[in-house]
Amino acid sequence: MRRIIIKNTKNIKQLTFDIPNDNGVYLLVGANGAGKTTLLTCLDRICNPYAFATNFTSANNTNNIDQYSASSIEYITEHAHIKFRKGTRRWACTPRTNSSPLLKREFGFENTIFIKADSKRIDVPQEEIRSGNLVDVESTIIESLNKIFETTKYNNLKRLRNVNGRGRNSTYFYILKDGRKYYSEKRFSTGELAIIRLVERLQTTMSNSLFLLDEAEMALHPRIQKNLLDYLNEKATEKD
């Protein structure tokens, strides 16, 4: 048994969710506001100690009311019971000692990757697209994108290696070459860019990871959605 119990968190009054024992691709279906993203955040917390701090932030209001003051999130297995509650400044858990490694070990995942449906996933400020060194994209990524979108245009997909303004870590942006012209990802559609990011992350994801994708349909044509689902099933089998 690998169970999560969520109470009084976002739009969820109470939810008991059992993680399937079999590896594979699973779809969460529900109306807008049903709490799907909240559940995905709780799943992300299995391996990501910053999941709650990043995604469960209190909205600013004049009454200084913490919307998570009555929240609780429990993780239960046959050998462990870990409970999180929102304290004054941060989420606290019981037991306090070694809770993160215990949670990861008991639920049996090496890592969690959460790709959220937000602007950070699909938007890059125009000022961040500067000159840099163009490098080839891995052939496995190109092949996967061509197959999903039923095209060959990604044969000329490139990365732009870009050192940020403060000289720190390099960032990669996708550039599509068309003759002598290069198109930055600012010209890509939302669904197109989201799948590029998705495929890139899946290529480097270690086996036995929990990969979480919010709003998987991403305004895609139903035929492309089917191709994407087939691709995800292939990767789930490959990284079992």
Predicted regions and their residues:
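Generic detector of short, locally flexible boundary/turn motifs and exposed helical patches
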Residues: 37-44, 81, 135-138, 162, ...
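Switch/communication elements of ASCE P-loop NTPase nucleotide-binding domains
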Residues: 2-34, 44, 184-240
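Phosphate-binding glycine-rich loops and adjacent basic patches that engage nucleotide phosphates
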Residues: 1-4, 99-111, 152-163, 189-199, ...
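Hydrophobic, Leu/Ile/Phe/Ala-enriched alpha-helical segments that form helix-helix packing faces
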Residues: 43, 47, 141-153, 202, ...
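P-loop NTPase switch/coupling surface
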Residues: 1-137, 144
